[in-house]
Amino acid sequence: MVHSVDELFAVVVREADDDDARWVAIRELHALGTREVFERAAQLCRSSDASARIAGADILGQLSAYADEATSILTSMLEDGDPGVVECVVHALGQQQDVRTIEALARAAIHDASNVRWAVATALEDLIGDERAERVMLSLMRDGDTSVRDRATFAVGSLSDHDTPRIRAALFERLRDDDRCVANEAALGLARRHDARAIPYIAGAVESADGEIEEAADEITAPDMLTELLKARDALGDVHGLKTLINRCRARL
């Protein structure tokens, strides 16, 4: 069924409680990608109603034909007084995967609302190769909110293959995180980079049912890690978890 632009905008604005319907309509508007769609979305961004501003930001996020103009509008909306609006704006900027948004997103990374900072950790995950984005993500890995630290550590450790001494140091630091999920993500990030500093943590947790640890154990028992595993045994002793890792590694030779 073909919907008019009026009908699609009506769904996006009015169906706040039906997220599936909203995003179906938003995707149709993205597919149209006309100047009319851009202008009407920009108008929504100037509304006094927060839900309308959210709708406008969601639409502008992927209008590639008007990316420069959309970025300018979205960046200005980071000063919005409603954290829910700012969160959506951050996600919209993240959709653009444009290094020109990094400085604006860096400012949002110190927002008072944790949901905004969490969104920044998502928005920058594909830009970590840029040193500015890396710095922001490493800062978010130390955030006071557990969910933000977890998201940033997951993005840096598992979603990105970018590898620098700073990233490894930040992941190693998070091995001591008070939250087990964050620490597990850090262990996986180090294991993916074949960093032997993850071995003691993984050995101590290998009997757990945690999915991240199972994946980390698979990474750290790659055939080229046997020497490091044996060094760890010399340092730590023949502990059960380490013995398990060594046996798994030898079985892969």
Annotate each PLM feature.
Residues 1-54, 62-63, 217-221, 229-253:
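N-terminal alpha-helical scaffold/docking segments in eukaryotic complex subunits
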Residues 1-12, 32-46, 65-79, 98-110, ...:
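Amphipathic alpha-helical scaffolding segments comprising HEAT/armadillo-like alpha-solenoid repeats
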Residues 17-20, 35, 50-51, 83-84, ...:
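Alpha-helix N-cap/helix-start positions at coil->helix boundaries
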Residues 20-23, 39, 54, 87-88, ...:
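Alpha-solenoid HEAT/ARM repeat scaffold
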Residues 122, 146, 151-158:
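Alpha-helical adaptor scaffolds
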Residues 180, 185-196, 200-253:
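Long, ordered, amphipathic alpha-helical scaffolds
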